Amino acid sequence: MGGNHLPVLYQGVSSMRLRSLWTVAAAGVLLLGVPGLAAAQDGSLVETDIALNTLWVVLGGVLVLFMQAGFLLLETGLSRMKNAGAVAGKVIMNLAIAFLMFWATGFALGFGEGNNFLGSAGWFLDLGGIDYGAGGGTEAFFFFQAVFAAVSLAIVYGTMLDRTKFAAYIVFGIVYIGVIYPIVAHWTWGGGWLAQDGFLDFAGSSIVHLQGALAALTGTLVLGPRLLKFRNGKAQPIPGHSIPLFMLGVIILWVGWMGFNGASTLAAVGQNFADVIVNTNLAAAGGVIGASIGSLIMFRTLDVSQMGNGAIAALVGITAGCAFVDPWAAVVIGFIAGLIAPPIVVLLDKMKIDDPIGAIPVHGIAGIWGTLAIGLFAPAARTVDADLGVSAGLFYGGGGEQLWVQFYGIAATIAFTGVLTLILWLVIKWTVGLRVSEDQEMAGLDISEHGMYGYPEQFIEVPGAFPESTRHSAGMASLARPSTMSD
C-alpha cells in the first residue's frame, strides 16, 4: 500500500502546483488589465459627470422657461381686465422671438469666438465643431442662455402694459434679442473685456435684469404714461384687477429662480449649487421684510404688491453675487433691495414715469445694487483671481478695486443699452408706430389689438348689436355694455 502512496501524493502536489500556476497566471492577467479597467472606469465616470451636468443645465433652463408663466400672472394681475389677453399674447410671442433670434444671431454675438466686444461665429448655432462642454454640451448651453434672454425681454414688455402696439413689441424684440442683449452678455459671459477686467455678474443682475429695465425705462419715456395716470399734476392709482394672480406669479418666479441662479454653475458635479440656492432664498426672504418696512414708511400700510415686488427685487439683487457672498450678506443684500423699492416707486410717480408693474425699481435699481454689492460683501476666498484682477470686497479688506470694476461695468451697460434702446424705440415710433390710439386704449388691447376678450364675461353682448362682419373687430368694444365688474 505504501508503494501506492507516492504517486498519489505526487499527483496531489502536482495538482496544487498546477492550481497555483493558474492562480499566478490569472493574477498576472488581472494585473495587466487593471490599467485598462481603471481607464474604462474613469471614462465611465467622465461620461456620467457630463450626463449629470447636461441634465442639471437643461432642468435649470426648464425652470427659467417656466418663469414666463410667472411674468404672465404677475403682469396680468397688475393690469386691468380689458388688457389681460394682450399680456398672454405678448408672453407667448416673447418666447418665439427669443428662441428664434438667439438661435439666428444672439448666441453667436454673445458666446461665439470673436473679439473682446462681440462674438462673430456660430450663426444659426453653426459653431464649426466648438463644444461648450462645461455645461454638458452646446445645445444645453444654448437652451439655457436663450431662456435667460427671454427673461430680459419680458422685463421690457411689462413696463409698457396697456398702451403699446403689439407690432412695436415684435420689432423691438427682434433687434433687442438679436443684437443688443447678447453684445453686453459677451462682455462678461463670453469672455469679453469686462470679464478680463475682473467684472463679476454670476447670473445676470446687470446682464439680464438691468438691461431689461433700461430698455423698459427708455421705452416708457418715449411711449408716455397711460391715459388718466397723471391728472392735476399728481399720479393717480390705476390698480390691477387681481392681487392673487400677481402673487402667484411672484411665487412662480421665486421657484424659477432656483434654476436661474442654481443652474448658472453650468455643472452639477464639483459645483456647490446648493450654496447658491440657499443664498438666493435667504435674499428673497430678506427682500419681503425690507419691502414691508419700506411700504410702512412710504404708504403707512403693508402693501401686498410691494411685498411681492420686494421678493423679486431681492432675487434680482442676489443674482449677481449668489455664488460670491456668505449667507448673512445675502440676507442684507436682499433686505436692502426690497427696502429701496417702494421709495423708487414714489420717485418715479413724482417724475411722471409710468411703470405699471414696478420693473424699473425691481429689475433696474435692484440690479445695480446687487452688482455693486459684490464689491462690498464678497470674501477673498470666493473671489480672488490674480489672473483676472478679481479681488475681495471692501468689507473683507479688498479695498475699493472690485467695487470700482463693478461700478464701471454697470456704467458701460447703462450707456450702451440705454442709448441703443432709446434710438430703437424712437425709430419704431416714427415708423410702425409705438402707441395705440386713445380709443383703443380705452377699449382695451384685448379687443382692439387681438379681437377677443381675456375675460369674455366682463362684457354683456347686446342682442343683435354685433354684425358677423364686425364681431371680432376693434369696433366691437363700443357696442359692448360693460358689466358691473371692474375693468
Feature names for model-found ranges:
Residues 37-487:
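Glycine- and aromatic-enriched membrane alpha-helices
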